[in-house]
């Protein structure tokens, strides 16, 4: 397959390099990744400023471009410039391997997940993948899983506007029990800010937080990881609350006319 590989940790991050080296054993891989770290930038794109895509001179079995933008920018450049200039299109967009998990409400902030969703908007089957350890992630486990997953899973089954969000426990591959289909959980953060003083005597604030995991759903994404499984969650860009919409339509119909 032809693969467009992006991330939010940056073009030289070990996660994307590990993924590229594994995937290029059996696939054609083009890396289009931010020239600097873009973690938690969400689905931002660059407007009213130029973008640069610089091909790197590397001794690797894949191509690598450093892009002066966000993960979503990297997907746009990868599809509309890099692959287009080759006269082909990727069969799948893969975003990762991310340093740290993207579970529950993480997906709202994640540049990694947004990279996959940008591919989904463009109509290319897309996958985001993260390893659930920020300090010492075992990327090889995620890379080996990806290579095997692409053999057994037909990416064409992923519809437009939908992506797979994959989270991998940071343990040796041999310790993984398998993978489970899961739902995006209500896992979230209770944030607070610590007031500090900079070297010039001015106040600044450092955001900290506690993880809240109280979702009763047995298919909640984070529960699969706690049980030693890889979590595979289909997510979509559409955010309409269908249940509330139906309830409000029962009260207001289509809405209310002012005139």
UniProtKB/Swiss-Prot annotation:
Transmembrane segments: none annotated. Its cofactor is a divalent metal cation. GO terms for cellular component: cytoplasm. Signal peptide: none annotated. Keywords: Cytoplasm, Hydrolase, Metal-binding, Nucleotide-binding. Binds 1 divalent metal cation per subunit. It comes from the Bacteria. One of its GO terms (molecular function) is metal ion binding. Its EC number is 3.1.3.5. It catalyses: a ribonucleoside 5'-phosphate + H2O = a ribonucleoside + phosphate. A divalent metal cation binds at residues 8-9, 39, 98. The keyword Nucleotide-binding applies. It is found in: Cytoplasm. InterPro entries: SurE, SurE-like_Pase/nucleotidase, SurE-like_sf. Belongs to the SurE nucleotidase family. This is 5'-nucleotidase SurE. It comes from Fervidobacterium nodosum (strain ATCC 35602 / DSM 5306 / Rt17-B1). The gene is surE.
């Amino acid at each position: 397959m032809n693969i467009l590989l992006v991330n939010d940790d940056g073009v030289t991050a070990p996660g994307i390099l590990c993924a590229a080296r594994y995937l290029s054993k059996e696939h054609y891989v083009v890396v289009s990744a931010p020239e600097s770290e873009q973690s938690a930038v969400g689905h931002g794109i660059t407007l009213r400023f130029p973008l640069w895509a610089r091909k790197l001179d590397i001794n690797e079995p894949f191509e690598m471009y450093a892009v002066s933008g966000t993960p979503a920018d990297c997907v746009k450049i990868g599809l509309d410039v890099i692959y287009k200039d080759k006269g082909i299109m990727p069969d799948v967009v893969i975003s990762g391997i991310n340093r740290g998990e993207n579970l529950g409400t993480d997906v709202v902030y994640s540049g990694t997940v947004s990279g996959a969703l940008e591919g989904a908007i463009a109509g290319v089957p897309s996958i985001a993948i993260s390893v659930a350890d920020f300090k010492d992630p075992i990327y090889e486990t995620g890379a080996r899983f990806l290579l095997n997953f692409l053999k057994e899973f037909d990416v064409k089954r992923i519809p437009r506007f939908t992506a797979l969000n994959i989270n991998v426990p940071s343990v040796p591959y041999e310790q993984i029990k398998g993978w489970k289909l899961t739902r995006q959980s209500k896992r979230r953060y209770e944030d607070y800010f610590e007031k500090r003083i900079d070297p010039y005597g001015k106040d600044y604030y450092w955001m900290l937080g506690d993880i809240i995991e109280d979702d009763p759903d047995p298919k909640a994404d984070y529960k699969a990881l706690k049980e030693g499984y890889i979590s595979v969650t289909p997510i979509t860009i559409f955010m309409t609350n269908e249940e509330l919409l139906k309830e409000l339509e029962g009260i207001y119909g289509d809405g209310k006319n002012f005139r």
